[in-house]
């Protein structure tokens, strides 16, 4: 077998007939498959053992040779080679065709490659291939020119002869008529008899004349056609062609079907055609030039790749190995077979029939019909349904052809190559495991035994509990008691991977150390639920076992849950306490008045705990407490002995126990937000392992006090504010007043609607405030909402105050409010209007999931080959960013959105303060601390490095990318940052709303939002309701003549004025990015400025303002959508995708390079070609950047394997084959498809041959992971979990 890791490129091309025969192990001559009685393959049939190999290992067909000792012998009786049966998965056969057929991909694809090459319209080509017209394949011009005078003379002679014959026939008939008339007169016949005879004769005369004229016309037509006959002319008139052939057959050749096309391709001169087309491109213009460019692409492809154009016509068809198109017997004795077998049978049947007809010398028309049917059979084998009606099987289902085997989700690429089912895996329902440590998971014993079976068996044999592997296997299957002890030993230190579908981002698969548990459900640590998006309402998870030491090391170092605390999308902690844990922390840190023990002072925490245990002190009572070794929260004085006296509560002191000693004392109420901030601070200053330790403690204390708090929910906790009736009465009066004004005609329908919405929004707000004021601090529901454990004030309002205004399915707000709340119950009408809009929400969610998944797939595809390839590309370019603004009092305040714009990037240039001192050096990582330092030094503008300005030849460099958000330090070389970017953008996609919101029926206001807006931006589509942009700087003039409104831009540069026709309802007064703009007569605008309310088209921004502006515009617009949903995504992720969208350049003028005008070229290749041209003293090419949508950009990738596995498989493969494309395997997908290690992370050369050597301290500490300190007494370890810094992992850690 070929080792996939030892080749580095893969080429595709057109297979010639000789190559197909060379692959083949024999010709398939019969359509038979399996003998229904013996169930053995028929000889020379589609499953023949002689061709494809034996069906049983080491056994020939007739049974003469059995056993492995005859390996390699070919049986002289049946001709079958004695070998393994799995050769039936790789051995191919072939069908030798009696007549050639064209390959449907090259003829019927869009555009038709055959049509472009030969310059024939596809419908004309179809006529030739399917025997409806003849094609002239060769003309002997020289002989025709030489013999033309003599031939013309012959034709003239023939013509004269025809005329003479006509004249003599006419004369003879007239004489006969006269004789007949004379005879009738002599006989005294009646006048009408005479007239009848005369009429009959005249008819006959006319008939003679028309017949003769037809022969003369036919002769003229044949002669004219022959005189002007050119190669590749089509002739659909069979009679005319036959006559021409019989008269002038030696001067030309013509035929029908694929034979004609093959002959043409054989004689086709690619070089001269290429020169002719280049000449047309230089001199021609318009349609002619465009067509020449398209044709040159195909001609040049054949010249460059060395493919033979004749290979597009097949003389033999390959037959794929039988095990790839199996036939299996069902229970009832019937057979289930792959559709391919039926399609192959049709080809073989028609081929054999054609052979018989040719041998019999059947008439041409019958042979041609059979050839056409053979062509159709091969077409449907290659791509069923591409032309005409698809061949269907039982139940009218179209049969799956070879193309269908590759295409779509169930095709070979996506089903079997990019995703496979694996062994050493299992799945089960998950339940919560609150007792687990963060790096642990609970694995059911029976499941673990099955997963670790080989390890257990080996260990049983090593410990001599079993004599051999077979008896060890038996012991495992019978579950002997000793097996469980061995299992316990085997699983120690062996991580397993847990995965929850859908795996939307890298945190969907994490490694844990398994703990054996009883039962059948997997136990999951509560803090990792948010990363997996898991809950315990019946979710299932899959377990996978890393087998090799390398895989185990990667799982432990890179994937262990304690090393995945940060979210790759924004670099903030994802493993945060939630639900009961928040309630526990909230209850613990509450300080209430009037509790037992209030005002007392305690000398130590132990004393306070003792008082609490004796019932003298309540947990939330305000007390004075003396504590040692803490960081005071405010400016309390530290006494000489290092102690501080604090105003606090026992609960707060207990809460601070779980935090590190050097963390400032927490003396405030802790809810979800506060815990988030605490963990965020800790993750900035501590290692992930230490943070995991703190998180575990927070979880334990949260659960403990959550239980002790006794928080419950009852209907009595829902308290409707007593002032509700009078609050509503006041607003009802205002609403009635608006209605009266409307009835009088004082306000319009729209104004009334807006007023009512305004009134009832205010009413809801006031009632909500009254409700909040009505809750006591210890009200359980209020505690849940206020702490952030569950629910929100909006939900609370609907239960306790009033439901308020609701939207209808279109997204418009219904101006009638729902005054009841759920506690009181809704009226029938109120219930109806509230469900009306609610249903739309449900349907939306279902649609959103699919759309979001598809967006993620496209994003992954476009960015999959962006990998960090080098440490520093050395560029000095960067993106300017504002980090602070003046608040009006001379103080700098931090701007919004720094977390996603500047945080975790590298500085591009030294940040210097007003005195010229360097505050932060270039290439420094910008964390929260550095940003605060810059603002404190009075710096408001900095320049940061970005992937958009990175100059790395492939992928990007570590400095331009900055900090890896999931590890918290500079990104490693080899990190697949493109995939991380795609996951980070796609993962929150499902949360984004689908709807287009109407704020109140104002035209132009229904701007696309949510997921459709993100798709619109990434696909670079022209937006709905797009606004024109100023083509250049100048002054606007508004022209309202001709019954339409025009904006005329009078340009400053003196060029022609630009006119923009805008709708009458267009808003010329609008807000854009926080500034109010008014477009009126005489207003001055800058180039690229928006001229009316709406959305700018990114293509226009690129054309007018250039690449940098369109990059900024796209980043800003995508961020806008995610920010409205509160999903923080770092800008570097969006930048990676945008960089991929702007990777291509359209060549306008080729200069002295090999590139063709109109060709799409990769930016790097374009710049390299230009540098080469200039170095050789030539002219560089001219081009302009292109903004491609992500789908188009994915298909335009250099890798044909990656593009084919994405979309339009047949089209991509057709193009790649003609161009003889080579895939250099630099991206991830192509390597996954081929089963190679991916060129990212540990798959890079650097890490391939690396050995992991633990230090002495790490070896000692390694055994202390799961024990308490008193459990061991060896080594020099500290008893902490393995400190990863001590492991010498190269660049991995």
From Swiss-Prot:
Keyword terms of this UniProt record: DNA-directed RNA polymerase, Magnesium, Metal-binding, Nucleotidyltransferase, Transcription, Transferase, Zinc
Catalytic activity field: RNA(n) + a ribonucleoside 5'-triphosphate = RNA(n+1) + diphosphate
Binding site for Zn(2+) 1: 60, 62, 75, 78
Cofactor(s) in the UniProt record: Mg(2+); Zn(2+)
Keyword Cytoplasm: no
MF GO annotations: DNA binding; DNA-directed RNA polymerase activity; magnesium ion binding; zinc ion binding
Any one annotated GO CC term: DNA-directed RNA polymerase complex
HAMAP family per the UniProt record, alphabetical: RNApol_bact_RpoC
Function: DNA-dependent RNA polymerase catalyzes the transcription of DNA into RNA using the four ribonucleoside triphosphates as substrates.
Protein name: DNA-directed RNA polymerase subunit beta'
Organism: Cutibacterium acnes (strain DSM 16379 / KPA171202) (Propionibacterium acnes)
Taxon lineage: Bacteria, Bacillati, Actinomycetota, Actinomycetes, Propionibacteriales
